[in-house]
Every structure is written in structure tokens, then in C-alpha cells.
Design a protein with these regions (language model features):
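N-terminal beta1-alpha1-beta2 submodule of the flavodoxin-like/Rossmannoid cofactor-binding fold
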Residues: 1-88
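Short, glycine-/small-residue-rich phosphate/pyrophosphate-handling segment
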Residues: 93-126
Length: 126
């Protein structure tokens, strides 16, 4: 989904940086799930980790997350929690933001995940 969104933005003339947030889970947890292990070992290394400099650089943002029991993934929440310095400086003022999510099943909490993530954006506005 992130790649499709990035491609669409680029086709519309935007300069795009596709990033991922750092993994927080212990290796044992990752190893216990073949799909997760494949992502961490084979897919993730091809996408740079997001930094605060990426957020400073961007004129707008699109945040994506899997739905985890109706909330954004802990990895994304933790990254957002590191942005206090930028928020305090007013770096996010007048920058548009959107979000997207997915889950493995219908009624998997997508609506509440988007609401929880978007609450960060609206309550963090100055």
C-alpha cells in the first residue's frame, strides 16, 4: 500500500521518500513467525529506516500501519513518540498528513486504528 501511494504521489509530481520505522520486537518473536521473519530479513533491508530528518524534509506525510487489535503498531507509535522536539518547534504546522492501514481479516479494527493514529495528528496540532 505504501509503495502504491508513493508511486501515485510521484506521478503527481511529488518528491517521495519511502521509509519504515525500526523494529522493536525481540528476534525470538520474529523467528517464531515465518512471514515476519521473511519481512525483517528480506524486505525491510531494502527500505531505509525513518529519521526525524525525513520528517523535517517532507512537506506532507502518509503514515501506514497494520492494525494491531484496533490500534497502530507499537513500532509506529514509538517512532511518533520521538517527534516531540519537532512538534515543539512547530515543524508540523500546515503540513498535510494522511494515514492508511490493513489487517488480515474483515472487521479487524481498521477504523479504530485510523482513528487512533489520526488523533495523534489532530491533538498534536498547534
Amino acid at each position: 500500500m505504501a509503495e502504491a501511494l508513493g508511486e501515485g504521489a510521484a506521478e503527481a509530481g511529488a518528491e517521495v521518500r519511502l521509509r519504515r520505522v525500526p523494529e522493536l520486537a525481540p528476534r525470538a518473536a520474529i523467528e517464531s513467525n515465518p512471514g515476519w521473519r521473511e519481512y525483517v530479513d528480506e524486505v525491510a533491508p531494502s527500505t531505509p529506516e525513518a529519521t526525524l530528518d525525513d520528517l523535517s524534509w517532507a512537506d506532507g506525510y502518509a503514515f501506514g500501519t497494520p492494525s494491531r487489535f484496533g490500534t497502530p503498531a507499537a513500532q509506529l507509535k514509538q517512532f511518533i513518540h520521538t517527534t516531540g522536539r519537532l512538534w515543539q518547534s512547530g515543524a508540523f504546522v500546515d503540513r498535510p498528513v494522511t494515514s492508511f492501514t490493513s489487517s488480515a481479516n474483515a472487521h479487524g479494527g481498521q477504523e479504530s486504528t485510523i482513528l487512533a493514529l489520526n488523533n495523534v495528528f489532530t491533538t498534536g496540532a498547534r
